[in-house]
Design a protein with these regions (language model features):
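Generic low-polarity alpha-helical segments
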Residues: 1, 7, 31-35
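Short, Lys/Arg-rich, polar N-terminal cytosolic tail immediately upstream
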Residues: 3-24
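Intrinsically disordered Ser/Thr phosphorylation hotspots
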Residues: 5, 53-59
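Generic preference for well-ordered secondary structure
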Residues: 17, 60-67, 121, 155
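Short helical patches
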Residues: 17-19, 65, 69-73, 214-219
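Metalloprotease/metallohydrolase-associated module, dominated by Zn2+-dependent proteases
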Residues: 21-55, 94-228
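Short pre-active-site segment immediately N-terminal to the catalytic Zn-binding motif
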Residues: 58-78, 92-95
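Active-site recognition of the HExxH zinc-binding catalytic motif
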Residues: 74-90, 102
């Protein structure tokens, strides 16, 4: 007769538990490394974002990395922004909504990604998306701060490379708020930083969960139950 091991299922359970623990440790490590990257990004952001007041230009490697990043990010946001306008052109929205829809899409894009991951139970990924909502809003704050330059956005400043209407000059003028452009841009910048900070704090608590004691208690309880 073939030999059977009556304790085989116990070995399998232990192997699965070890694999689960190893997988959990790997995920936590990945989260902590990612958190470190975002903390560093947030600390350096005011010095290397080309539209920030404290921006200082240099030829350092860090500057070049940020320049490349902002180029890619701005192209992505630009495509989404113009897509928002495009939807309104197709649907024949009122002119004010058409002007606003570019920024709405630009903020909704990372926001909906965050909502998707949140509904799937992936809080860390949702917080990363929330961080980019703040990043996108920071870009919006800069765009707001240029509203005083005029209704017509010159081709060399336009994403599409042609003369265009400045969204915020149009909207602020329509609401009689153009004189308060600096205040509105400043408040928007503050909210953007607040969102990014909240996202990073959330990542920290998710990357450093206080579950070690709970796991130990669970293991002891499980062993005690088997012994009894």
């Amino acid at each position: 007769m073939p030999e059977t091991n009556p304790f085989k299922h116990l070995h399998q359970d232990n192997a699965k538990e070890e694999e689960s623990e190893s997988s959990l440790r790997s995920r936590i490590l990945a989260k902590r490394v990612t958190l470190g990257v975002f903390v560093l990004f947030l600390l350096l952001f005011p010095h290397y974002a080309p539209w920030e007041p404290s921006y200082t230009q240099s030829n350092s490697l860090t500057q070049q990395i940020f320049t490349l990043y902002f180029f890619v990010a701005n192209q992505t946001l630009g495509i989404v922004h113009e897509g928002g306008h495009g939807v309104c052109y197709i649907l024949h929205c009122p002119e004010f909504i058409t002007m606003a829809n570019g920024t709405i899409f630009q903020l909704l894009f990372p926001g909906l990604i965050g909502y998707y991951y949140y509904k799937r139970g992936n809080l860390f990924a949702a917080l990363i998306a929330l961080f980019f909502v703040g990043f996108s809003l920071q870009y919006t704050a800069w765009y707001l701060s240029t509203a005083h330059e005029g209704l017509i956005l010159p081709a060399h400043k336009s994403f599409l490379g042609v003369d265009a209407i400045h969204d915020f000059n149009y909207m602020l003028s329509a609401m009689g708020l153009l004189a308060y452009e600096s205040l509105i841009a400043g408040l928007t910048r503050f909210v953007a930083y607040l969102i990014m900070l909240v996202a990073v704090i959330g990542m920290f608590f998710d990357a450093f969960p206080n579950q070690d004691k709970k796991r130990k208690v669970k293991r002891r309880w499980g062993r005690g139950k088997k012994d009894s």
